[in-house]
UniProtKB/Swiss-Prot annotation:
Gly residues bias: start-end ranges: 211-257
Membrane topology, record value: Single-pass type I membrane protein
Gene (name only): III
Organism of origin: Enterobacteria phage I2-2 (Bacteriophage I2-2)
Protein name per its UniProtKB record: Attachment protein G3P
Ranges for region CT: 252-434
InterPro entries hit by this protein: Attachment_G3P_N, Attachment_G3P_N_sf
Biased composition (Low complexity): 193-206
Region span, N1: 19-88
Localization per Swiss-Prot or TrEMBL: Virion; Host membrane
Region (N2): 132-200
Length: 434
């Protein structure tokens, strides 16, 4: 029996210990109403008596209605809460009982009792326990390193990568590599977050002489003591040895095949690359200054548009001048030469027989004072404007007031007409610039 109690206790403890905490989002009171019902009965005299009754069952129904109202609001708000807290669960907590502003009773008139219940909308708050980092996250969080490394691999996009301490690093910043690309020095090896597989070769930092081989004619001890630089024999080197030495095993051949990257090599490479780096930065951050070309092109377009407008105005002025000026010729005040209007008049006279000076011709239908300046209708005078004549609310507007209103409306029409003409002219100019 004791084991069963312990097992049950553990079963209850485990889920409760991992349960989320709940916090309140909003609290409100929700209402339901119990309306009185008419009950008819007979008194001692046999007369019908009507009473308005509210029972305890009605109060229970009103309380359930209040809880249902709270549930409806919660269902609607849950969508909003999910957008704000996507990782939380939501619940509605209501009281077991409602608060009433009355008690079951009977009255002679219709009446009601209000039932209120408190509703608390809550959300779950997960326990803030730090999760264990994955190997990728551990690698990505490591700081950048610098230095010279061996076993460098080249990526498909041309980048250089190393496998160091179980994490992959990419060469950034200034990078210098040997001809074969297996040994590189970089000012910043940054972790990529990738964890190499167990079968991939690892990289290690390289010191002066660590990557040197035996060179030509070197011995087994050539690597750690300088390889090509000190190659040759068992104790050979640039100065030669008692058994190996010489130009072949020592300086010339051994140095060219086993030399590692040194600080001086990196410094020299950076010095040589500095001019090209500066030019590349300049080309990336600057662009050709074509402001003068754009300004010149804009000025040319403006000049062409202005010339077109000026020619059109001059042509129209010459046509009107030749029509109204009897003298014409060089003494004309409106310019010398024919206009498009003159050519149209000549064409009408030559092909259609319409003469400008002919009486009864088609010209007279529009080239006369009435056609050029048509008279505006003047109406039939002015009379007072009367509304609701003969009633208490009769309204009289005299002719003087009507004249003022007419003047104001005329001025408004003049302004609108001027604005329309101005807009039309400017739109033509804009089209000319385009």
């Amino acid at each position: 029996m004791k084991r069963k109690i312990i097992a049950i206790s553990l079963f209850l403890y485990i889920p409760l210990s991992n349960a989320d905490n709940w916090e309140s989002i909003t609290k409100s009171y929700y209402t339901g109403f119990a309306m009185s019902k008419t009950v008819e009965s007979k008194d001692q005299d046999g007369k019908t008596v009507r009473k308005e009754v509210i029972t305890q069952a009605d109060l229970t129904t009103a309380c359930n209605d209040a809880k249902a109202s709270a549930q409806d609001v919660f269902n609607q708000m849950k969508l909003t809460f999910s957008g704000i807290w996507p990782d939380s669960q939501f619940r509605l907590v209501t009281g077991d009982t409602c608060v009433y502003n009355g008690s079951p009773s009977e009255k002679t008139e219709s009446w009601s009792i209000r039932a209120q219940v408190e509703g608390d909308m809550q959300r779950s708050v997960p326990d803030e326990e730090p999760s264990e980092q994955t190997p990728e996250e551990i690698c990505e969080a490591k700081p950048p390193i610098d230095g010279v490394f061996n076993n460098v691999s080249k990526g498909d996009e041309g980048g250089f990568y190393i496998n160091y301490n179980g994490c992959e690093y990419e060469a950034t910043g200034v990078t210098v590599c040997q001809n074969d690309g297996t040994v590189c020095a970089s000012s910043a090896w940054k972790p990529t977050g990738y964890v190499p597989e167990s079968g991939e070769s690892s990289s290690s930092p390289v010191k002066d002489g660590d990557t040197g081989g035996t060179g030509e004619g070197g011995s087994d001890t050539g690597g750690d003591t300088g390889g090509g630089d000190t190659g040759g024999g068992s104790t050979g080197g640039d100065t030669g040895g008692s058994t190996g030495g010489g130009s072949t095993g020592g300086g010339s051949t051994g140095g060219s095949t086993g030399k590692s990257l040194t600080k001086e090599d990196v410094t020299a490479a950076i010095h040589d690359a500095s001019p090209s780096i500066g030019d590349a930065v300049k080309d990336s951050l600057t662009e050709d200054n074509d402001q003068n070309d754009n300004q010149k092109k804009a000025d040319e377009q403006s000049a062409k548009a202005s010339a077109s407008v000026s020619d059109a105005i001059s042509d129209g002025m010459r046509g009107v001048g030749n029509f109204v000026d009897d003298l014409g010729g060089e003494s004309s005040q409106y310019g010398i030469g024919n206009s498009e209007m003159d050519l149209s008049v000549s064409l009408a006279k030559g092909q259609l027989g319409i003469d400008l000076e002919g009486h009864g011709s088609a010209w007279e239908s529009f080239l006369n004072d009435g056609a050029l300046r048509p008279s505006i209708p003047s109406g039939h005078g002015c009379t007072d404007f009367v509304m609701f004549q003969g009633s208490v609310y009769q309204l009289d507007i005299g002719c003087d007031k009507l004249g003022d209103i007419k003047s104001v409306l005329s001025w408004v029409m003049y302004c609108l007409t001027f604005w329309y003409v101005f807009q039309s002219a400017t739109s033509l100019l804009r089209k000319g610039e385009q």
